[in-house]
């Protein structure tokens, strides 16, 4: 097959075996995917693959970098407390101790954990408003964007056995060490989510779509989520 390029357009003398042209042109999506995940389920990888399939921005640890830029605090400092809750934010909220904005004005010195949550809350809201379609992993994005009609809340899970095996291979540790890491990480994420949202992390009633990454694997799971997004957008446009 000979392919010629003319004036920036790819032309072919033989179309057999080529993908449908519609499959080459990126679709313009409206959906914002807020993706929660169990540790070891491959949620981050699935989110990255989904963002590539949709040709939209992907945000996970990138939110830490954005928070650091806005606050002037080192990214390493925020990374060490990311998705970790404290018990002081509700008190500050009840006393009106701070203003919800990109700058903090407070009579109470909020811990960095709470400042990071507030700042990421603002960043996620700004991203949804200004950038539109994207994939956001964790950080209570499903709750923050709960009133946004374009937000699709997704939770990725997998059987414990498969998660243990994944973390074993990824980190080069024993099965016992992998299980311990999974339990601790999931507990930290649950505490963070439950505290800041007053919801139950991982409860399927809090998500529009809950999907197991096993046995499909990350690629097929991302494709399944995308099919749901496509159908959802079609239904909403009718």
Per-range role (PLM):
Residues 35-48:
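Glycine-rich phosphate-binding P-loop
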Residues 57-68:
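Short beta-strand-centered segment that lines the nucleotide-binding/catalytic pocket of NTP-utilizing
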């Amino acid at each position: 097959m000979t392919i010629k390029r003319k004036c920036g357009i790819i032309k072919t003398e033989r179309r057999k075996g080529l993908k449908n042209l519609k499959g080459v042109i990126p679709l313009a999506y409206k959906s914002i995917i807020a993706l929660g995940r169990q540790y070891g389920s491959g949620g981050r990888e699935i989110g990255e693959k989904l963002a590539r399939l949709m040709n939209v921005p992907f945000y996970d640890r990138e939110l830490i970098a954005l928070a650091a830029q806005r606050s002037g605090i080192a990214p390493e400092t925020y990374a060490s407390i990311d998705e970790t809750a404290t018990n002081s934010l509700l008190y500050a909220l009840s006393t009106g101790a701070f203003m919800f904005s990109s700058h903090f004005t407070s009579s109470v010195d909020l811990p960095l954990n709470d400042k990071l949550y507030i700042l990421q809350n603002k960043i996620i809201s700004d991203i949804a408003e200004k950038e539109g379609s994207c994939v956001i992993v964790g950080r209570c994005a499903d709750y923050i964007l709960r009133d946004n009609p374009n937000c699709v809340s997704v939770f990725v899970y997998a059987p414990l056995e498969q998660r243990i095996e994944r973390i074993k291979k990824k980190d080069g540790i024993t099965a016992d060490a992998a299980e311990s890491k999974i339990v601790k990480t999931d507990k930290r994420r649950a505490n963070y989510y439950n505290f800041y949202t007053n919801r139950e992390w991982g409860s399927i009633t809090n998500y529009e779509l809950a999907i197991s990454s096993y046995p499909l694997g990350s690629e097929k799971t991302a494709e399944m989520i995308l099919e749901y997004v496509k159908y959802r957008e079609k239904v909403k446009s009718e």
